[in-house]
Amino acid sequence: MSPKKKAVVLLSGGLDSATTMAIAKAENYELYALTFQYGQRHAVELEAARRIAAALGAKEHLFISIDLRIIGGSALTGPFEVPKKQEGEETSAEIPVTYVPARNTIFLSYALAWAEVLQISEIFIGVNAVDYSGYPDCRPEYITAFEAMANLAIKAAVEGTMRVKIRTPLIDLSKADIIRKGMALSVDYGLTHSCYDPLPDGKPCGQCDSCHLRRKGFREAGFDDPAFSET
């Protein structure tokens, strides 16, 4: 019997990462979930990540703490206000203040290190270049560049015992398509959290970019969003 396939999966607790993890599970990977506590104001997503990992049967779930508040530069980790807008209001084409400097590079670097230790060649990340907020580290060319760097940077790749592959199953999907994919895989989106600036009780604000993208996706996919069923 051939050994079971294994994958490191970046799991934030949000809709995209939950769907990505469900896709990896459907492809019969043994799941090694990786979640970061980086000083984000929406720390409620950490508990969401814990619930998702348990529901999808992760073999291991590693939490890593990095205080990116020290660096600042983002509304998610600093004193800036998270932008709010009304339903139907256009999203700016500029990179928003919710961009966290080099976040995916930092996260993928930790994932790469853990994957090398575990001798796992595939890393799943739920980046999306269609319905997204303009983040530069969600683009296909960024992923291609990181993968090339990874295979120059680690001992296993240089020695030829492992070739790293960064898997991005959502990269070309709309938010509605992501939700349809997840529903087909029985993802419980009631476990997920997407809001950048949750209310004191942990419920979504309903006005940040992430809330708007999520609502729009569920509406276009033809499903009710459990995050807003009681808000």
Curated annotation (Swiss-Prot):
The alphabetical list of record keywords is: ATP-binding, Ligase, Metal-binding, Nucleotide-binding, Queuosine biosynthesis, Zinc
Q: Which CDD domains match?
A: QueC-like
Q: Name one GO biological process term.
A: queuosine biosynthetic process
Q: Where does ATP bind?
A: L11, S12, G13, G14, L15, D16, S17, A18, T19, T20, M21
Family annotation (InterPro entries): QueC (IPR018317), Rossmann-like_a/b/a_fold (IPR014729)
Cofactor: bound how, per the entry note?
A: Binds 1 zinc ion per subunit.
| Database matches in Pfam families | QueC
GO MF term (any one)? ATP binding
Name the top EC class.
ligase
Q: In which pathway does it act?
A: Purine metabolism; 7-cyano-7-deazaguanine biosynthesis
Query: Is the Ligase keyword given for this protein?
Result: yes
**Sites where the protein binds Zn(2+):** C195, C205, C208, C211
What cofactors does this protein use?
Zn(2+)
Q: What EC designation does it have?
A: 6.3.4.20
Which catalytic reaction applies to this protein?
7-carboxy-7-deazaguanine + NH4(+) + ATP = 7-cyano-7-deazaguanine + ADP + phosphate + H2O + H(+)
Write out the similarity annotation.
Belongs to the QueC family.
Q: Which HAMAP family match?
A: QueC
Q: What does this protein do?
A: Catalyzes the ATP-dependent conversion of 7-carboxy-7-deazaguanine (CDG) to 7-cyano-7-deazaguanine (preQ(0)).
NCBIfam families from the xrefs?
A: 7-cyano-7-deazaguanine synthase QueC
Give the protein name, as stated in the record.
Answer: 7-cyano-7-deazaguanine synthase
Its source organism is Syntrophus aciditrophicus (strain SB)
Gene designation:
queC
